Amino acid sequence: FYMDRILAREGVCSGNAGSNGNADGNTFLTRGRALYMYTSSPSVIGFGGNTAYHQPLGRGDLVRVLFSNADGSLTTKEDTSKRVNAPSNWSSTYSVGSNLTLDVVKFIHQENVAVTTMTLTNKSAEDQAITVAADSIFATEPGKVTVNGAEQTELTGTCSSPAGLTTIYARMTGDGFEAASSDDYCWLSRDVTVPAGGSVELKVVIAFTTEEIPESTEQYLRFAGLGNLEAVRAQKAEYNLYWAENLPYIDVPKKAVQKAIDYRWWLERFNSLDANIPGYDYQSPVTIEGVLGYNNAIILTQPMHLQDTKWLRSPYLAYGQLLSAGNSSQSSAFLDNPGNRNNWNNHYGQYLAEAGYEAFNVIGGGAELAENLAYYFGHDATGQLEHYGNHIEGRDLIAYRNNYMTGNDADTISMHAPGTGTWKAHGENAYVWAAADAAAKLYEQLGNTEQAKYYRDLADKIKADVLELMWCEECQKFETYAVRPTGTQHNANQPNLVKYTESNNYNYFAVGLVPDDAASVTKYKEALKAFSNGKEFPIFPFYTANQVHNQEVSGSNPLISTRRACSSAG
């Protein structure tokens, strides 16, 4: 399978995850729609690490498999040279004691079912009697389950997902395993005799089921009833079928560039969540800014993901993003998804309406969808103005007091230039215009002339204010507008303008706000000369701040590329 082949990581991979994830770069690559491993511990046979269901649960391993004989516990050690970490499955080989080897292939199915298949081989000349134990902190209550018409032992458990968004019902079973217990703690146990020179197959299946995803129960029972080879083949085929059905064909001559594209597609799938949780958070599929880091559907980066996901043949993720953001924002400016309440839940500067309108043009849809999107886009524009638009009297412009609202944090050097005061109108006004413009266009297509006129008039007002207040005639570029500066910045005729610029000051070009008649092109194209000399905005690496200006007012992270220009899935 192509994606497995091109993206597989062999052996121990290098990488520095900073404060999150795995320092060795060996994050488990397969995941379910909501169940995944926030960290991975390959030394644990099964699924070791910090188990996550839409967010880390902080309760440790999902499942452990241990071995013992009459003399006591058997030590296991991975042969890391045999490790292959592929998008659909993870495989490796372990030594068990002194004369046994264990081949492991494990995966997490789309429907939140984690399967560990094992082949235990005896290298000695004598039969070996072994006890295999499998335990999970999430499933400790013994019971029975019917698999392929026959009863077998099952362990179950219940817990709440982070922030109490849903209830998880864990279910675990294994081929030939029975319940064992000690001090009120229960696990699965199986005694096996591995013949001299022979092998024994083992399998443990655990699922996180919920009321809102009945498919998890169906797939749990299905994989519990499959043989090892059947289970692995089914996972590989079904996981990779997604790519065959969804990816547009792109032929890139340079293999390194092609791999980067493939990896980006994989990132969009890995950094997504389809938990189907009722309410105003994860009720629709969403993309996440780094499931191993921020782990939030932060509104700032939703349009960046959408620029990718709109090209998938299935609209489930692209439209899931839009419907989730629109519904969660409740008739106001687009808001961070509230599902992760440890994060900011703010109305950041973002261009989701512009990207959403582009997605609608690519994917298509009916009048009902267009009506919803127009409503969301329009209320994002008016909501932004309600939240941040009361600082410049008589103008339809938003202003921020904090540099992180732009997404570039301290590298928004114009926001902390000396003498600029507290509030600044910045390049995110382009996105407010784009939201009003997108709403107007959709209402025009729907034939709703009243709403179309309302948002067209609003877009025109924003455009007029931007062109009048934020264009520096002296410097021939768009600049940040200090609402109440403590002194003239650099232009006596336009004393509110700040000369220091970032890539965000060019948002007006990106969204199409800048007029394109002949006279306007002649005038405004002068601003683009900053990209021509390689000193202000180098091609690579691409910096957030104008690097000439950054020498005068340094940002904290000059090497961080702007999210708008070089978006990442996390």
Regions found by a protein language model. Name each.
Residues 1-255, 569:
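Terminal accessory carbohydrate-recognition/targeting modules of carbohydrate-active enzymes
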Residues 232-371, 378, 495-511, 544:
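Substrate-binding groove/exosite segments of carbohydrate-active enzymes
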Residues 555, 568-569:
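Short, positively charged low-complexity motifs
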